[in-house]
Amino acid sequence: MNTDEIYAKIPHGKDDKPFLLFEPNKVMEYDIYDVDGPFAMTNKELVGCNVVLPFSKPMRTDIAGIATVNGKSVPVVVAMSQIWNMDIWWAGIKFGGALREYGQKATVTVSGFVDTDGNEMIPAQFTVHTAEKVKAKKEDIVHEKVALNAAEEGIVLLKNENGTLPLSVDETLNVFGKGQHEFRFCAIGAGKTNPRYNVSFLEAAEHSRFMLNSELSEFYACGEDTLPPEELVTKAKEKSDKAIMLISRSMGEGFDATSRKGEFYATDEEDALLKFLRKNFAKVIVILNTGYPIGTEFLEGADAILYTGFGGMLAGQAIVNVLNGTVNPSGKLPDTWAKRYEDIPSSKNFYNAVEGKPRIGTDCGEIWLDTVYEEGIYVGYRYFQTFGKEVGFPFGFGLSYTNFSIRAKGISYDGKSLHFTAEVANTGKVAGKETVQIYLKKPNGKIEKPVRELVDFEKTRLLSPKEMQTFSFSVPNSSMTSYDEETSSYVMEKGIYEVFVGSSVAAEKAGEFRLTADKTVQTVKPVMRPIEEIKELSQKDEKGTYPTGARSGVKEGITYL
Protein backbone atom coordinates (compact mmCIF):
# COMPACT_ATOMS: atom_id res chain seq x y z
CA MET A 1 0.00 0.00 0.00
CA ASN A 2 1.50 3.37 -1.05
CA THR A 3 1.26 6.63 0.87
CA ASP A 4 -1.69 7.90 -1.20
CA GLU A 5 -3.65 4.74 -0.42
CA ILE A 6 -2.82 5.01 3.27
CA TYR A 7 -3.89 8.66 3.36
CA ALA A 8 -7.15 7.84 1.57
CA LYS A 9 -8.13 5.58 4.48
CA ILE A 10 -7.64 8.35 7.06
CA PRO A 11 -10.75 10.50 7.74
CA HIS A 12 -9.85 13.97 6.52
CA GLY A 13 -13.10 15.58 5.44
CA LYS A 14 -14.08 19.15 6.23
CA ASP A 15 -16.04 18.15 9.35
CA ASP A 16 -13.68 15.42 10.54
CA LYS A 17 -11.78 16.22 13.71
CA PRO A 18 -8.00 15.95 13.34
CA PHE A 19 -6.06 13.43 15.40
CA LEU A 20 -2.51 12.24 15.89
CA LEU A 21 -1.44 9.04 14.15
CA PHE A 22 0.19 6.52 16.48
CA GLU A 23 -0.38 2.99 17.76
CA PRO A 24 -2.46 3.58 20.91
CA ASN A 25 -1.47 0.37 22.70
CA LYS A 26 2.22 0.57 21.89
CA VAL A 27 4.74 2.13 24.26
CA MET A 28 7.00 4.52 22.35
CA GLU A 29 10.71 4.05 22.95
CA TYR A 30 12.59 7.32 23.42
CA ASP A 31 16.34 7.99 23.40
CA ILE A 32 16.97 10.78 25.91
CA TYR A 33 20.03 11.90 23.93
CA ASP A 34 18.27 12.24 20.57
CA VAL A 35 17.62 15.92 21.20
CA ASP A 36 16.42 16.85 17.71
CA GLY A 37 14.45 13.72 16.87
CA PRO A 38 14.07 12.14 13.43
CA PHE A 39 12.47 14.97 11.45
CA ALA A 40 14.35 18.18 12.35
CA MET A 41 16.11 18.04 8.97
CA THR A 42 12.72 18.38 7.23
CA ASN A 43 11.69 21.57 9.04
CA LYS A 44 13.77 23.77 11.34
CA GLU A 45 10.70 24.36 13.52
CA LEU A 46 11.08 20.75 14.67
CA VAL A 47 14.56 21.34 16.09
CA GLY A 48 14.61 20.20 19.71
CA CYS A 49 11.48 18.08 19.29
CA ASN A 50 12.19 14.66 20.76
CA VAL A 51 8.96 12.98 19.67
CA VAL A 52 7.26 13.95 16.42
CA LEU A 53 3.85 12.57 15.39
CA PRO A 54 1.81 13.26 12.22
CA PHE A 55 -1.66 14.82 12.22
CA SER A 56 -4.45 13.38 10.10
CA LYS A 57 -5.22 16.76 8.50
CA PRO A 58 -3.59 20.13 7.69
CA MET A 59 -3.30 22.14 10.90
CA ARG A 60 -3.20 25.81 11.84
CA THR A 61 0.15 26.88 13.22
CA ASP A 62 -1.14 30.09 14.81
CA ILE A 63 -3.30 28.40 17.46
CA ALA A 64 -1.32 27.01 20.35
CA GLY A 65 -2.03 23.59 21.76
CA ILE A 66 -0.90 21.92 24.97
CA ALA A 67 1.41 19.00 25.68
CA THR A 68 2.11 17.46 29.06
CA VAL A 69 4.47 14.82 30.45
CA ASN A 70 3.08 13.22 33.61
CA GLY A 71 0.85 16.25 33.97
CA LYS A 72 3.69 18.76 33.60
CA SER A 73 3.46 21.19 30.68
CA VAL A 74 6.19 20.95 28.02
CA PRO A 75 6.75 22.94 24.80
CA VAL A 76 5.01 21.66 21.65
CA VAL A 77 4.95 23.02 18.09
CA VAL A 78 3.04 22.33 14.89
CA ALA A 79 5.05 22.34 11.68
CA MET A 80 4.63 21.10 8.13
CA SER A 81 7.20 19.31 6.01
CA GLN A 82 7.14 17.38 2.78
CA ILE A 83 7.88 13.68 3.16
CA TRP A 84 7.00 10.82 0.82
CA ASN A 85 5.85 13.51 -1.67
CA MET A 86 3.15 14.60 0.76
CA ASP A 87 2.63 17.68 2.89
CA ILE A 88 2.47 16.39 6.45
CA TRP A 89 1.62 18.40 9.57
CA TRP A 90 3.44 17.31 12.70
CA ALA A 91 3.14 17.78 16.43
CA GLY A 92 6.68 18.16 17.75
CA ILE A 93 7.03 17.65 21.50
CA LYS A 94 10.04 19.00 23.38
CA PHE A 95 10.64 16.91 26.48
CA GLY A 96 13.78 18.84 27.46
CA GLY A 97 14.56 18.04 31.07
CA ALA A 98 11.13 16.56 31.79
CA LEU A 99 12.38 13.12 30.70
CA ARG A 100 16.06 12.53 31.29
CA GLU A 101 16.21 9.42 33.46
CA TYR A 102 17.06 6.02 31.99
CA GLY A 103 14.29 3.38 31.93
CA GLN A 104 11.55 5.85 32.83
CA LYS A 105 7.90 5.53 31.76
CA ALA A 106 5.76 8.61 31.29
CA THR A 107 2.28 9.54 30.12
CA VAL A 108 2.17 12.17 27.38
CA THR A 109 -0.91 14.15 26.33
CA VAL A 110 -1.44 16.50 23.39
CA SER A 111 -4.58 18.62 22.95
CA GLY A 112 -5.99 21.94 21.80
CA PHE A 113 -4.64 22.18 18.25
CA VAL A 114 -7.04 23.18 15.48
CA ASP A 115 -7.11 22.16 11.81
CA THR A 116 -7.49 24.52 8.85
CA ASP A 117 -11.23 23.73 8.77
CA GLY A 118 -11.63 25.01 12.32
CA ASN A 119 -12.03 21.63 14.05
CA GLU A 120 -10.27 21.07 17.37
CA MET A 121 -8.22 17.89 17.54
CA ILE A 122 -9.23 14.74 19.35
CA PRO A 123 -7.03 14.77 22.48
CA ALA A 124 -4.22 12.22 22.38
CA GLN A 125 -2.64 10.25 25.19
CA PHE A 126 0.21 7.77 24.91
CA THR A 127 3.07 6.26 26.89
CA VAL A 128 6.77 6.73 26.28
CA HIS A 129 9.63 4.76 27.76
CA THR A 130 13.17 6.08 27.90
CA ALA A 131 15.85 3.65 26.81
CA GLU A 132 17.71 1.70 29.45
CA LYS A 133 21.26 2.77 30.31
CA VAL A 134 23.89 0.99 28.24
CA LYS A 135 26.92 0.03 30.29
CA ALA A 136 30.47 0.39 29.06
CA LYS A 137 32.16 -2.85 28.00
CA LYS A 138 35.73 -3.87 28.68
CA GLU A 139 36.37 -4.63 25.02
CA ASP A 140 35.37 -1.08 24.07
CA ILE A 141 37.73 0.75 26.44
CA VAL A 142 40.38 1.46 23.79
CA HIS A 143 37.78 2.84 21.37
CA GLU A 144 36.22 5.00 24.06
CA LYS A 145 39.60 6.44 25.01
CA VAL A 146 39.96 7.58 21.40
CA ALA A 147 36.48 9.13 21.48
CA LEU A 148 37.19 10.93 24.76
CA ASN A 149 40.57 12.20 23.59
CA ALA A 150 39.06 13.58 20.38
CA ALA A 151 36.38 15.43 22.36
CA GLU A 152 38.89 16.82 24.86
CA GLU A 153 41.39 18.04 22.28
CA GLY A 154 38.63 19.65 20.22
CA ILE A 155 37.45 21.94 23.02
CA VAL A 156 38.54 25.54 22.48
CA LEU A 157 39.09 27.93 25.38
CA LEU A 158 38.03 31.28 23.92
CA LYS A 159 38.31 33.42 27.03
CA ASN A 160 39.65 33.00 30.56
CA GLU A 161 39.82 36.25 32.49
CA ASN A 162 41.90 36.22 35.69
CA GLY A 163 42.20 32.44 35.77
CA THR A 164 38.46 31.79 36.05
CA LEU A 165 39.13 28.25 34.84
CA PRO A 166 39.92 25.61 35.86
CA LEU A 167 37.50 25.26 38.76
CA SER A 168 38.36 23.60 42.05
CA VAL A 169 37.25 19.97 42.05
CA ASP A 170 34.81 20.47 44.95
CA GLU A 171 33.07 23.44 43.26
CA THR A 172 29.28 23.51 43.07
CA LEU A 173 28.14 23.94 39.48
CA ASN A 174 25.32 26.45 39.10
CA VAL A 175 24.21 25.65 35.54
CA PHE A 176 21.74 28.06 33.93
CA GLY A 177 19.88 27.87 30.63
CA LYS A 178 17.77 25.33 28.78
CA GLY A 179 20.85 24.27 26.80
CA GLN A 180 21.84 21.91 29.63
CA HIS A 181 18.79 19.81 28.72
CA GLU A 182 19.35 20.16 24.96
CA PHE A 183 22.98 19.07 25.00
CA ARG A 184 24.02 17.91 21.53
CA PHE A 185 26.58 15.27 20.63
CA CYS A 186 26.32 15.44 16.84
CA ALA A 187 24.61 17.05 13.88
CA ILE A 188 21.33 15.90 12.32
CA GLY A 189 20.92 13.99 9.08
CA ALA A 190 24.11 12.50 7.66
CA GLY A 191 26.05 14.10 10.52
CA LYS A 192 24.17 12.04 13.09
CA THR A 193 26.11 9.44 15.06
CA ASN A 194 24.75 6.32 16.72
CA PRO A 195 27.18 5.28 19.47
CA ARG A 196 26.52 2.58 22.04
CA TYR A 197 25.76 5.28 24.60
CA ASN A 198 26.33 8.98 25.29
CA VAL A 199 27.39 10.98 28.33
CA SER A 200 25.85 14.44 28.53
CA PHE A 201 27.32 17.38 30.42
CA LEU A 202 24.80 17.05 33.25
CA GLU A 203 25.38 13.31 33.58
CA ALA A 204 29.14 13.76 33.64
CA ALA A 205 28.85 16.54 36.23
CA GLU A 206 26.60 14.42 38.44
CA HIS A 207 29.18 11.62 38.47
CA SER A 208 32.19 13.87 39.05
CA ARG A 209 33.66 15.37 42.21
CA PHE A 210 31.78 18.56 41.39
CA MET A 211 28.50 19.16 43.20
CA LEU A 212 25.69 19.89 40.74
CA ASN A 213 23.01 22.36 41.82
CA SER A 214 20.19 19.95 40.93
CA GLU A 215 17.45 22.36 42.02
CA LEU A 216 18.65 24.87 39.45
CA SER A 217 18.93 22.25 36.71
CA GLU A 218 15.41 21.09 37.51
CA PHE A 219 14.16 24.66 37.10
CA TYR A 220 15.46 24.70 33.50
CA ALA A 221 13.70 21.44 32.69
CA CYS A 222 10.92 23.80 31.55
CA GLY A 223 12.74 24.17 28.24
CA GLU A 224 12.97 27.96 28.41
CA ASP A 225 15.82 30.39 29.17
CA THR A 226 13.76 31.97 31.93
CA LEU A 227 15.23 34.25 34.58
CA PRO A 228 15.24 32.24 37.82
CA PRO A 229 13.32 33.42 40.89
CA GLU A 230 15.23 35.41 43.53
CA GLU A 231 15.06 32.59 46.09
CA LEU A 232 16.75 30.16 43.69
CA VAL A 233 19.47 32.69 42.86
CA THR A 234 20.15 33.37 46.53
CA LYS A 235 20.57 29.64 47.20
CA ALA A 236 22.85 29.29 44.18
CA LYS A 237 25.10 32.15 45.32
CA GLU A 238 25.44 30.51 48.73
CA LYS A 239 26.79 27.40 47.01
CA SER A 240 29.16 29.19 44.61
CA ASP A 241 29.92 32.69 43.34
CA LYS A 242 30.26 31.29 39.82
CA ALA A 243 27.54 30.72 37.22
CA ILE A 244 27.69 28.52 34.13
CA MET A 245 25.43 29.20 31.15
CA LEU A 246 25.15 26.47 28.54
CA ILE A 247 24.02 27.50 25.06
CA SER A 248 23.21 24.84 22.48
CA ARG A 249 22.45 25.10 18.76
CA SER A 250 21.29 22.45 16.31
CA MET A 251 22.78 22.02 12.86
CA GLY A 252 22.71 19.52 10.02
CA GLU A 253 21.57 18.87 6.50
CA GLY A 254 18.26 19.88 4.96
CA PHE A 255 18.27 23.61 5.75
CA ASP A 256 20.97 26.24 6.14
CA ALA A 257 21.20 28.16 9.38
CA THR A 258 20.27 31.85 9.33
CA SER A 259 21.14 35.01 11.21
CA ARG A 260 17.89 34.76 13.16
CA LYS A 261 17.92 35.05 16.92
CA GLY A 262 18.42 31.57 18.27
CA GLU A 263 20.71 30.66 15.38
CA PHE A 264 23.59 33.06 14.61
CA TYR A 265 22.39 35.71 17.04
CA ALA A 266 21.41 35.21 20.67
CA THR A 267 17.75 35.13 21.56
CA ASP A 268 16.40 37.95 23.69
CA GLU A 269 16.06 35.42 26.52
CA GLU A 270 19.70 34.28 26.20
CA ASP A 271 20.90 37.87 26.17
CA ALA A 272 18.78 38.78 29.20
CA LEU A 273 19.90 35.69 31.13
CA LEU A 274 23.59 36.35 30.52
CA LYS A 275 23.21 39.98 31.63
CA PHE A 276 21.34 38.76 34.72
CA LEU A 277 24.15 36.35 35.60
CA ARG A 278 26.83 39.02 35.16
CA LYS A 279 24.92 41.21 37.58
CA ASN A 280 24.41 38.51 40.22
CA PHE A 281 27.57 36.37 40.15
CA ALA A 282 31.27 37.16 40.54
CA LYS A 283 32.26 34.92 37.63
CA VAL A 284 30.26 33.81 34.58
CA ILE A 285 31.34 30.88 32.41
CA VAL A 286 29.67 30.28 29.04
CA ILE A 287 29.74 26.86 27.36
CA LEU A 288 28.95 26.96 23.64
CA ASN A 289 27.61 23.58 22.50
CA THR A 290 27.17 24.61 18.87
CA GLY A 291 28.18 23.23 15.51
CA TYR A 292 28.97 26.60 13.97
CA PRO A 293 30.17 30.10 14.93
CA ILE A 294 27.64 32.47 16.46
CA GLY A 295 27.66 36.23 16.95
CA THR A 296 29.99 37.18 19.76
CA GLU A 297 28.91 40.67 20.85
CA PHE A 298 26.56 39.43 23.58
CA LEU A 299 29.35 37.24 25.03
CA GLU A 300 31.69 40.12 25.81
CA GLY A 301 30.81 40.24 29.52
CA ALA A 302 31.57 36.57 30.19
CA ASP A 303 34.66 35.78 32.27
CA ALA A 304 35.36 32.45 30.56
CA ILE A 305 34.07 30.90 27.33
CA LEU A 306 34.43 27.29 26.20
CA TYR A 307 33.54 26.26 22.66
CA THR A 308 32.85 22.53 22.63
CA GLY A 309 31.40 21.95 19.18
CA PHE A 310 29.72 18.55 18.92
CA GLY A 311 32.09 16.27 20.79
CA GLY A 312 30.51 12.89 20.17
CA MET A 313 29.54 10.20 22.67
CA LEU A 314 31.76 11.38 25.54
CA ALA A 315 31.39 15.11 24.98
CA GLY A 316 29.98 15.72 28.46
CA GLN A 317 32.86 13.96 30.19
CA ALA A 318 35.35 15.92 28.08
CA ILE A 319 33.86 19.23 29.24
CA VAL A 320 33.99 18.21 32.90
CA ASN A 321 37.63 17.16 32.47
CA VAL A 322 38.46 20.61 31.08
CA LEU A 323 36.49 22.46 33.76
CA ASN A 324 38.27 20.65 36.60
CA GLY A 325 41.72 20.95 35.03
CA THR A 326 42.29 17.23 34.47
CA VAL A 327 42.66 18.21 30.82
CA ASN A 328 44.27 21.44 29.64
CA PRO A 329 42.28 22.71 26.62
CA SER A 330 44.29 22.76 23.40
CA GLY A 331 41.73 23.13 20.60
CA LYS A 332 41.99 25.85 17.94
CA LEU A 333 39.23 27.51 15.95
CA PRO A 334 38.90 26.17 12.39
CA ASP A 335 37.09 29.34 11.32
CA THR A 336 36.76 33.04 12.11
CA TRP A 337 34.07 34.11 14.56
CA ALA A 338 32.64 37.43 13.41
CA LYS A 339 31.04 39.81 15.86
CA ARG A 340 28.11 40.41 13.52
CA TYR A 341 26.71 38.41 10.62
CA GLU A 342 26.79 41.53 8.47
CA ASP A 343 30.58 41.75 8.90
CA ILE A 344 30.99 38.71 6.63
CA PRO A 345 31.18 39.74 2.95
CA SER A 346 29.42 36.60 1.71
CA SER A 347 26.37 37.58 3.80
CA LYS A 348 25.35 39.85 0.93
CA ASN A 349 24.85 36.88 -1.40
CA PHE A 350 24.07 33.95 0.88
CA TYR A 351 20.32 33.32 1.12
CA ASN A 352 19.26 34.30 4.62
CA ALA A 353 15.72 33.36 5.64
CA VAL A 354 14.95 36.44 7.73
CA GLU A 355 12.47 39.32 7.60
CA GLY A 356 9.65 37.11 6.35
CA LYS A 357 11.68 35.22 3.76
CA PRO A 358 10.86 31.48 3.84
CA ARG A 359 13.42 28.82 4.60
CA ILE A 360 14.52 26.93 1.50
CA GLY A 361 15.62 23.37 2.04
CA THR A 362 16.71 20.42 -0.04
CA ASP A 363 13.13 19.22 -0.55
CA CYS A 364 11.34 22.52 -1.16
CA GLY A 365 10.31 21.75 -4.73
CA GLU A 366 11.50 23.25 -7.99
CA ILE A 367 13.25 26.40 -6.81
CA TRP A 368 16.37 27.92 -8.35
CA LEU A 369 18.43 29.63 -5.67
CA ASP A 370 21.41 31.47 -7.14
CA THR A 371 24.46 32.43 -5.08
CA VAL A 372 27.12 34.61 -6.70
CA TYR A 373 30.48 34.44 -4.94
CA GLU A 374 31.36 38.12 -5.15
CA GLU A 375 33.73 37.78 -2.18
CA GLY A 376 36.14 35.87 -4.45
CA ILE A 377 39.14 34.57 -2.49
CA TYR A 378 38.25 36.59 0.61
CA VAL A 379 36.59 33.91 2.71
CA GLY A 380 36.99 33.76 6.49
CA TYR A 381 40.33 34.94 7.87
CA ARG A 382 41.60 35.85 4.39
CA TYR A 383 39.02 38.65 4.34
CA PHE A 384 39.27 39.81 7.95
CA GLN A 385 43.08 39.84 7.99
CA THR A 386 43.49 41.46 4.58
CA PHE A 387 41.02 44.27 5.15
CA GLY A 388 41.82 44.77 8.84
CA LYS A 389 38.32 44.09 10.14
CA GLU A 390 37.73 43.45 13.82
CA VAL A 391 36.56 39.95 14.77
CA GLY A 392 35.14 38.22 17.82
CA PHE A 393 37.70 35.42 17.78
CA PRO A 394 40.30 34.91 15.02
CA PHE A 395 41.03 31.82 12.96
CA GLY A 396 43.34 29.33 14.68
CA PHE A 397 42.73 30.91 18.09
CA GLY A 398 42.55 28.94 21.32
CA LEU A 399 43.83 29.60 24.84
CA SER A 400 45.42 27.27 27.39
CA TYR A 401 45.77 27.05 31.17
CA THR A 402 49.50 27.51 30.62
CA ASN A 403 51.70 29.72 28.42
CA PHE A 404 53.94 28.88 25.47
CA SER A 405 56.70 30.54 23.52
CA ILE A 406 57.22 29.75 19.83
CA ARG A 407 60.52 30.55 18.11
CA ALA A 408 61.31 29.94 14.44
CA LYS A 409 64.91 29.37 13.34
CA GLY A 410 66.86 28.94 10.13
CA ILE A 411 64.31 30.06 7.56
CA SER A 412 65.57 29.19 4.07
CA TYR A 413 64.25 28.46 0.59
CA ASP A 414 65.98 26.03 -1.78
CA GLY A 415 63.85 26.56 -4.87
CA LYS A 416 61.55 23.64 -4.08
CA SER A 417 60.51 24.12 -0.46
CA LEU A 418 60.58 26.51 2.46
CA HIS A 419 62.58 25.06 5.38
CA PHE A 420 62.92 26.03 9.04
CA THR A 421 62.59 24.72 12.58
CA ALA A 422 60.22 25.90 15.30
CA GLU A 423 60.86 25.51 19.01
CA VAL A 424 57.82 25.39 21.29
CA ALA A 425 58.43 25.79 25.02
CA ASN A 426 55.95 25.54 27.88
CA THR A 427 56.71 28.65 29.92
CA GLY A 428 53.80 28.23 32.32
CA LYS A 429 53.08 26.19 35.42
CA VAL A 430 50.99 23.26 34.15
CA ALA A 431 51.36 20.71 31.36
CA GLY A 432 49.69 21.47 28.04
CA LYS A 433 49.72 21.23 24.26
CA GLU A 434 50.21 23.97 21.66
CA THR A 435 49.69 24.14 17.91
CA VAL A 436 52.35 25.81 15.76
CA GLN A 437 50.74 27.54 12.78
CA ILE A 438 52.62 28.69 9.67
CA TYR A 439 51.22 31.50 7.52
CA LEU A 440 52.56 33.06 4.35
CA LYS A 441 52.20 36.54 2.89
CA LYS A 442 52.84 36.38 -0.83
CA PRO A 443 54.11 39.32 -2.89
CA ASN A 444 51.67 41.67 -4.59
CA GLY A 445 51.66 41.06 -8.32
CA LYS A 446 49.25 40.40 -11.14
CA ILE A 447 47.28 37.86 -9.08
CA GLU A 448 45.04 38.99 -6.18
CA LYS A 449 46.22 37.52 -2.87
CA PRO A 450 45.21 37.76 0.81
CA VAL A 451 47.79 38.99 3.32
CA ARG A 452 47.82 35.66 5.18
CA GLU A 453 47.45 32.05 4.08
CA LEU A 454 47.83 29.00 6.32
CA VAL A 455 50.39 26.67 4.75
CA ASP A 456 51.19 24.21 7.57
CA PHE A 457 50.66 23.43 11.25
CA GLU A 458 51.72 20.90 13.89
CA LYS A 459 50.52 20.12 17.41
CA THR A 460 52.93 19.33 20.22
CA ARG A 461 52.83 16.38 22.55
CA LEU A 462 51.86 17.11 26.16
CA LEU A 463 54.64 19.41 27.36
CA SER A 464 55.47 19.71 31.05
CA PRO A 465 56.46 23.13 32.45
CA LYS A 466 59.83 24.24 30.98
CA GLU A 467 59.74 21.36 28.48
CA MET A 468 60.43 22.09 24.80
CA GLN A 469 59.62 20.39 21.50
CA THR A 470 61.26 21.19 18.15
CA PHE A 471 59.55 20.76 14.78
CA SER A 472 61.18 20.71 11.35
CA PHE A 473 58.98 22.22 8.65
CA SER A 474 59.28 21.81 4.89
CA VAL A 475 56.60 23.67 2.96
CA PRO A 476 56.61 22.65 -0.73
CA ASN A 477 56.10 25.05 -3.64
CA SER A 478 52.67 23.52 -4.25
CA SER A 479 51.50 25.00 -0.93
CA MET A 480 52.79 28.49 -1.76
CA THR A 481 51.25 29.11 -5.19
CA SER A 482 48.42 31.32 -6.42
CA TYR A 483 46.06 30.42 -9.25
CA ASP A 484 46.43 32.42 -12.46
CA GLU A 485 43.08 32.31 -14.29
CA GLU A 486 44.56 33.62 -17.53
CA THR A 487 47.04 30.75 -17.91
CA SER A 488 45.18 28.14 -15.81
CA SER A 489 48.37 27.70 -13.81
CA TYR A 490 49.45 27.57 -10.20
CA VAL A 491 52.19 30.16 -9.99
CA MET A 492 54.66 31.57 -7.46
CA GLU A 493 55.03 35.20 -8.50
CA LYS A 494 58.37 36.89 -8.02
CA GLY A 495 58.92 39.07 -4.96
CA ILE A 496 59.24 38.76 -1.20
CA TYR A 497 57.47 35.93 0.65
CA GLU A 498 56.98 36.73 4.34
CA VAL A 499 56.73 33.86 6.85
CA PHE A 500 54.63 34.15 10.02
CA VAL A 501 54.87 31.60 12.83
CA GLY A 502 52.64 31.53 15.90
CA SER A 503 49.57 30.10 17.60
CA SER A 504 46.84 31.72 15.47
CA VAL A 505 46.36 33.79 12.33
CA ALA A 506 47.72 36.73 14.35
CA ALA A 507 51.18 35.10 14.26
CA GLU A 508 54.27 37.32 14.22
CA LYS A 509 56.67 37.59 11.30
CA ALA A 510 59.56 35.13 11.60
CA GLY A 511 61.42 35.70 8.35
CA GLU A 512 61.20 35.99 4.57
CA PHE A 513 62.66 34.82 1.29
CA ARG A 514 62.81 36.35 -2.17
CA LEU A 515 61.90 34.86 -5.53
CA THR A 516 63.63 36.65 -8.42
CA ALA A 517 61.42 35.30 -11.20
CA ASP A 518 57.92 33.90 -11.60
CA LYS A 519 57.74 30.13 -11.15
CA THR A 520 54.97 28.01 -12.72
CA VAL A 521 54.42 24.98 -10.50
CA GLN A 522 51.49 23.33 -12.29
CA THR A 523 49.30 24.00 -15.32
CA VAL A 524 45.81 22.52 -15.42
CA LYS A 525 42.84 22.36 -17.79
CA PRO A 526 40.35 25.20 -17.17
CA VAL A 527 36.88 24.00 -16.15
CA MET A 528 33.80 25.57 -14.54
CA ARG A 529 34.53 29.07 -15.78
CA PRO A 530 31.68 31.48 -14.97
CA ILE A 531 29.34 32.07 -17.91
CA GLU A 532 29.03 35.71 -16.86
CA GLU A 533 31.89 37.73 -15.44
CA ILE A 534 31.77 38.23 -11.67
CA LYS A 535 33.10 41.43 -10.17
CA GLU A 536 35.04 40.08 -7.20
CA LEU A 537 36.15 41.85 -4.04
CA SER A 538 39.61 43.36 -4.47
CA GLN A 539 42.13 45.18 -2.29
CA LYS A 540 42.62 47.61 -5.16
CA ASP A 541 39.09 48.97 -4.79
CA GLU A 542 37.35 47.67 -1.67
CA LYS A 543 34.47 50.13 -1.84
CA GLY A 544 33.83 49.61 -5.54
CA THR A 545 34.06 45.82 -5.42
CA TYR A 546 32.48 44.98 -2.07
CA PRO A 547 29.66 42.42 -2.58
CA THR A 548 26.19 43.80 -3.23
CA GLY A 549 24.15 40.60 -3.56
CA ALA A 550 22.22 42.11 -6.47
CA ARG A 551 22.53 38.99 -8.62
CA SER A 552 21.83 36.41 -5.92
CA GLY A 553 18.59 35.00 -4.57
CA VAL A 554 15.57 33.06 -5.82
CA LYS A 555 15.21 33.23 -9.60
CA GLU A 556 11.56 33.32 -10.62
CA GLY A 557 10.56 30.99 -13.45
CA ILE A 558 13.86 29.10 -13.44
CA THR A 559 14.04 25.53 -12.12
CA TYR A 560 17.14 24.17 -13.87
CA LEU A 561 20.49 25.28 -15.28
Name the predicted role of every residue range:
Residues 47-83, 111, 124, 128:
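Short, surface-exposed alpha-helix to beta-strand junction/turn motifs within ectodomains of secreted
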Residues 46-48, 84-88, 99-103, 413-415, ...:
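Surface-exposed coil/turn segments at beta-strand junctions on protein surfaces, enriched
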Residues 45-54, 415-421:
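Contiguous beta-strand segments within globular domains
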Residues 53, 88-96, 473:
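A generic structural motif
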Residues 45, 83-85, 115, 484-485:
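Acidic/polar residues at beta-strand termini and the immediately following turn/coil
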Residues 37-44, 408-413:
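Short beta-strand segments of immunoglobulin-like
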Residues 45, 57-63, 99-102, 427-433:
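A short beta-turn/strand-edge loop motif at beta-sheet boundaries
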